[in-house]
Amino acid sequence: MKINCLFCCMSHRRFNRRSSSRQSIKDCIDAKNNITTFDNISFKTDSSRRRYISEEIAKLGKGNISAHIFTFRELCVATKNFNPDNQLGEGGFGRVYKGQIETPEQVVAVKQLDRNGYQGNREFLVEVMMLSLLHHQNLVNLVGYCADGDQRILVYEYMQNGSLEDHLLELARNKKKPLDWDTRMKVAAGAARGLEYLHETADPPVIYRDFKASNILLDEEFNPKLSDFGLAKVGPTGGETHVSTRVMGTYGYCAPEYALTGQLTVKSDVYSFGVVFLEMITGRRVIDTTKPTEEQNLVTWASPLFKDRRKFTLMADPLLEGKYPIKGLYQALAVAAMCLQEEAATRPMMSDVVTALEYLAVTKTEEDGQTVEGEEEEEEDERSKL
């Protein structure tokens, strides 16, 4: 499937996103000797882990870490002793609570990492460093952290609408209404801008490595922000084409070349974006064992449908109830298909994806003046004239 024509049509909308002075992590950190070697960080004893993690963050950040250091007592007060009534979510990393802090006075989300979970000291360090040094409207803001004793706690800005997963894949459990088409395109465009910033503005580039619906948080106006940077990795530098690392991330979202070889590039994130975008279009989970065998893997199910434009409407989320522009659906599926190309080199850059999605995001459904059925009839009339 070709998407080049879509990008050409919208070339007049493309912005010069690559700043002449890329935001440099290297200005704050010796990238060669520090941030690229997070995998080699080790703490010789349990006491050194507990005692010196804040000093390690300060040393690596070279005084550029602005995040507030909270005491465990302060966060107990903020969350009312981590009261279950204040719990916002739970995952393999631990639990997230709503809290109220006094300095600065604001409502926050407090993520208490599970001491036996997958996110250990290394991932904790990476997340604090990344969110302290990288700033963008589509990245969640880190307010502070706590490393008292064996506690590992991250304090974020509070996002009123939770995660994209809550509104897309967990509707019944969370008693949410399905997102309309325009909101889905708005969220997709914003999340794409976050990845574009990491790939094309941060210096050196950052590979997110864990792009999924549960890591996309939404504010009260459904503006998206990427969260959970524990698995983020600094991208290749100095002429290198990829970073070799052990495979991490969530099953179903990993690019095939990364899953098979451990070779990681920014195009690995592009694939993951394609998976999530396809989830947003279809309302289906990437892996759903409740469906028939041939439909359990979202990408496998979608692949043959991508080749037949007449079947595109079969891929739209039934909860949209046909309320979407048919041309917008075709273009959105074209973007998803390009992001999901098997060969990494054939996937678009995130700046191209942003260009396409910003066009879709400003093309409001109600402005089209046609129902889906009306557009289909128009297309049928055009075909009959040929």
From Swiss-Prot:
It catalyses: L-seryl-[protein] + ATP = O-phospho-L-seryl-[protein] + ADP + H(+); L-threonyl-[protein] + ATP = O-phospho-L-threonyl-[protein] + ADP + H(+). This is Probable serine/threonine-protein kinase PBL23. The keyword Kinase applies. Residues 365-386 are annotated as: Disordered. It comes from Arabidopsis thaliana. It is found in: Cell membrane. Its EC number is 2.7.11.1. It is a lipid-anchor. Belongs to the protein kinase superfamily. Ser/Thr protein kinase family. A lipid is attached at C5 (S-palmitoyl cysteine). The lineage of its organism: Eukaryota, Viridiplantae, Streptophyta, Embryophyta, Tracheophyta. GO terms for biological process: defense response. GO terms for cellular component: peroxisome; plasma membrane. Keywords: ATP-binding, Cell membrane, Kinase, Lipoprotein, Membrane, Nucleotide-binding, Palmitate, Plant defense, Serine/threonine-protein kinase, Transferase. The active site is at D210. Residues 82-360 form the Protein kinase domain. InterPro entries: Kinase-like_dom_sf, Prot_kinase_dom, Protein_kinase_ATP_BS, Ser/Thr_kinase_AS. ATP binds at L88, G89, E90, G91, G92, F93, G94, R95, V96, K111. GO terms for molecular function: ATP binding; protein serine kinase activity; protein serine/threonine kinase activity. CDD domains: STKc_IRAK. May be involved in plant defense signaling.
